[in-house]
Each structure stands twice: as C-alpha cells, then as structure tokens.
Amino acid sequence: MDKMRILKESRPEIIVGGKYRVIRKIGSGSFGDIYLGMSIQSGEEVAIKMESAHARHPQLLYEAKLYRILSGGVGFPRIRHHGKEKNFNTLVMDLLGPSLEDLFNFCTRHFTIKTVLMLVDQMIGRLEYIHLKCFIHRDIKPDNFLMGIGRHCNKLFLIDFGLAKKFRDPHTRHHIVYREDKNLTGTARYASINAHLGIEQSRRDDMESLGYVMMYFNRGVLPWQGMKANTKQQKYEKISEKKMSTPIEVLCKGSPAEFSMYLNYCRSLRFEEQPDYMYLRQLFRILFRTLNHQYDYIYDWTMLKQKTHQGQPNPAILLEQLDKDKEKQNGKPLIAD
C-alpha cells in the first residue's frame, strides 16, 4: 500500500451536521473555503462552505441567514444545513456548476451576443429579487454567477452574499442614509463610480456593476484592467480614474446601443431610486428578438461541448482547477482589479 493511500485512509473524516461527508476542497469564496460534500444517506453531492469559528469577522452565519431570506427565489441555491462543527462554521448548500468566469475562459474569452443576452435577462432578474428582499449584493462579478447542474444546468444562480447589506428596513421601508465616507467594498474592476468615490452603495450600484460585467463579456477585457501601480490603493485610484474618464459610448463601442442605454440609465439613478427592472429587461428582450435569436438555452459552451464531444463539465473539477489557478497568485485580495 503506497504512502498516499495510507495518509488518505488515516485522515479523520469530517462529518457536517451528522449528515454530510466532506470530500475535498473545490474553491474559495470571499470568506472561507468551499468543499465538495456528499449526503451520507442519499449519496447526493452538495457544496459545503467552511470558515474558522475564530475568524476575526465571521461571515458564514450571516450569509446563511441571507440565503434563508432568499429561499424560494429562482436562481439561488437551497440551504441544507448551517451551524458549527468543531472549530468551523459550516454552510451546506446545493452544489452548482462552473462560474461565468470559468465558462468565459472555456469559450476562449468570447461570448456571442446571443449568449450575453440570455445571461443578461437572468442576471437582471436575480438582482431584482435580492433588491425586493431589501438587500444589495455589493460584489457583482462573473465569478459570483454560476450555472446549475443536472436539470438546472441552463439556469443561472447568484452566490456569495458575504458582502451583502440591507439597504432598507422591510417593515418601515426606510432606506439607509446617504454617506460619503465609505471604503470600497467588492471588486474594483466591476465597482460603480460612486463606490470608488466612497459613496454608500444602493441598488443603483449593483445595476451599474452588472453593466460592466456585460461589457466585459462583450469586449473580452475592460479598459481599466491590468493597471500598474506600486500599491493597491494607487491601483484602485488608477482604475477609478480610467473608469471615470472613459465615456460610456467609448466603452460600449461595437456593441448594440442598448448596452450604452443601460449604463447611462444606471448612472442617472438617484441614491434611493428603485431601478425599472422591467424596462431594462425589455430593452434587451426587444434587441434579442430584433436579432432573430431563439431563447433556447443553447449557450456558447453548449455548442463548444457538442463540437468537442464532451459531456457537461464536472463542476467540482472546474472549481478545483479555478482554485488552483488562484492559489498561483499571491492570495486572493478582497478587492481585486
């Protein structure tokens, strides 16, 4: 018997909630690590998120609370269990497939307009739902949108609510107050201009971030990517300056006018104003029909897999590879470019 096998067999099993066996690490979230798990009773695969119970700023139980609030919404994973296991806070949820960042790379960093528009419709819907529940996400990026698996493989899910914040009291309907002394929360590449300026985030900022995600998929790269600087703070300032100095029409050049209309609309929203989600969805739905596309859930990666005779990508393997790639960098910062 080789040494590796002896090590594997001697390693104590981790059982979460008395029902789920931890198999292996498959990724990292904004806080903590994500593991592939399995139901001891049914053999069904699940995702298990774990963070140290001694973390300076524990987030997992807060995130579990948010998932409970969002339960029943289309495109949000179900929570199976959350609690404490020895030295860890744990959260057991539906296992999902690859992220849009994974799939963008799988498609050699090019999405057709049809794929972008099918995703846009679902992404706007996910944001509308969390806003309806009085929360803003504050970290909208391709890594936090995942496709489902099995019968949900064509459905888009929104995850990672560690940075989410309640923007309105659900009972009194009072909105949080306007402030201008906030640190940048989220990922600098997709952050709104107001977030860069230290203004308290609200619904408009999630929507603007989504606009940058759309243009990332349309262009393959955003003008403020790869900025060189001596410190992180200088880098964020350069990203902010480039973002503010790039006219929307320049950013959206080569894309249908609806994308610049979307971003101009989002940037014009007032702090407490509710976005007109239906107007925005209709903007892109009409474009979709004008281009004579069918909403058949055949994405670019669906076509690519058919051409290469591959089955559905194993979510655990894809996420594990993504995590290895990230570990090659010097750790994942909370705020990346």
From Swiss-Prot:
GO (cellular component) term, any one: cytoplasm
Activity regulation details: Activity increases following DNA damage.
Record has Kinase as a keyword: yes
Disulfides per UniProt: none
Pfam families noted in UniProt: Pkinase
Principal location class: cytoplasm
Residues at which ATP binds: I26, G27, S28, G29, S30, F31, G32, D33, I34, K49
Cofactor(s) required, per the database record: Mg(2+)
GO molecular function annotation: ATP binding; protein serine kinase activity; protein serine/threonine kinase activity
All residue ranges annotated as the Protein kinase domain in the record: 20-288
Biological processes annotated in GO: DNA repair; glucose homeostasis; negative regulation of canonical Wnt signaling pathway; negative regulation of hippo signaling; negative regulation of smoothened signaling pathway; positive regulation of proteasomal protein catabolic process; positive regulation of proteasomal ubiquitin-dependent protein catabolic process; positive regulation of smoothened signaling pathway
InterPro entries: CK1_Ser-Thr_kinase, Kinase-like_dom_sf, Prot_kinase_dom, Protein_kinase_ATP_BS, Ser/Thr_kinase_AS
Protein known as: Casein kinase I isoform alpha
Record organism: Drosophila melanogaster
Lineage: Eukaryota, Metazoa, Ecdysozoa, Arthropoda, Hexapoda
